Amino acid sequence: MAIKANEISSLIKKQIENFTPDFEVAETGVVTYVGDGIARAYGLENAMSGELVEFSNGILGMAQNLDATDVGIIVLGDFLSIREGDTVKRTGKIMEIQVGEELIGRVVNPLGQPVDGLGELNTGKTRPVEAKAPGVMQRKSVSEPLQTGLKAIDALVPIGRGQRELIIGDRQTGKTSVAIDAILNQKGQDMICIYVAIGQKESTVRTQVETLRKLGAMDYTIVVTASASQPSPLLYIAPYAGAAMGEEFMYNGKHVLVVYDDLSKQAVAYRELSLLLRRPPGREAYPGDVFYLHSRLLERAAKLSDDLGGGSMTALPFIETQAGDISAYIATNVISITDGQIFLENDLFYSGVRPAIDAGSSVSRVGGAAQIKAMKKVAGTLRLDLASFRELEAFTQFGSDLDEATQAKLNRGRRTVEVLKQPLHKPLAVEKQVLILYALTHGHLDNVPVDDVLDFETKMFDFFDANYADLLNVITDTKDLPEEAKLDEAIKAFKNTTNY
């Protein structure tokens, strides 16, 4: 059989035309140093700040330092499996995390991977971990209350949906308990909660998750955990991951509460990374942009305008102080970023006042706009009363001769302190808070022994649930007080059934 040259040439031409090369072009570099959660790579000349890079073993990193000769990378995974001389390539992408309703009830790490042993997660949706905060015209004033269920907060330092309220205090003063109670109180309030645990012991996080699960709060809660044993890059990225998950719900018209527990540990992790990346240290060895670290995170919390769906994201960041020093660097930074702070005091905590909220140092810059009408009426003078009581209490240590008015103020103050105490994980519905505060401010507790105030409160709630539920319903439905004469009559009817 004769071979025809023209047939062979046409076949070769056809194959050349249909040839598709089986390779991809990627800019690669070589790892020159790796250790303590960071790596340096030579050869990634066109890498961008914040760009994801991929090491030869599949682990991802994020470009942070763009120097003339090399790129400083934070490693988002096990840096021990990376070796000097390994190749690293650009991906052309920024870091994204999976978001969506499928995350509710799950415990995930800052990369969005489940760590609760309940199976794989694939939400099908992602959002950038770092996102631009809503602009001025995209926001709306905070006007809806976010009830925490804690009398001391809802009466003295009210929080609104879309607010940023700092919780600050020494270690072991009940900061996490305040946040867990606030999450528990969102049951049935059409609220999604995200608890971001940064740099905590895994056993502690496990305890918090078990508490939330046992009390039915995991049905509307996502837990993001970067434990103390994990590399610094994961602790640094964790709050932004939590914010990205919250934004998905906020931009879909829903309401979200995000707890960052705590940002002091994130700042320490960022300081560690910055020093390892040879960035110049500033005050307390923190880098110069440590303010921006927290401001760009907390500015993402907002109450969106009606045009954008009216959703909200409320932030409760934590800062741990040393010996009550709220004038420290990170503490003052975050105080200046947030819309108020709740200061938890050591002395109050150990004297049995729990939650240990210092009414003098705590403030909400949203204030009455985040309270229902009924609460405004009963809690209006509470802060002043408490402040003058503390002043009088200090003054009376030097003398015992007191006139009747001063004695009455002291008696009312002691009962106020008792009323604001609350057992752990027992948040209180707002109508019951209004009821007990009404009884306090209208003198119904003046003849109740101080030690019996909490017992009086419990019995009064039971009595109202059984006999005067309609009065409580008026507060729930109208957000205002019922007729004062009816309320006084009902409280007197209760007192007649007791020895008070």
UniProtKB/Swiss-Prot annotation:
**Domain of life according to the entry:** Bacteria
GO cellular component, alphabetical, reads: plasma membrane; proton-transporting ATP synthase complex
Which Gene3D superfamilies does the protein's record reference?
Answer: 2.40.30.20, ATP synthase alpha/beta chain, C-terminal domain, P-loop containing nucleotide triphosphate hydrolases
Q: What reaction gets catalysed by this protein?
A: ATP + H2O + 4 H(+)(in) = ADP + phosphate + 5 H(+)(out)
Q: What top-level class of enzyme does the UniProt entry assign?
A: translocase
Site described as Required for activity, located at 362
> What protein does this entry describe?
ATP synthase subunit alpha
**Source organism of the structure:** Lactococcus lactis subsp. cremoris (strain MG1363)
Q: What is the lineage of its organism?
A: Bacteria, Bacillati, Bacillota, Bacilli, Lactobacillales
Q: Which gene encodes it?
A: atpA
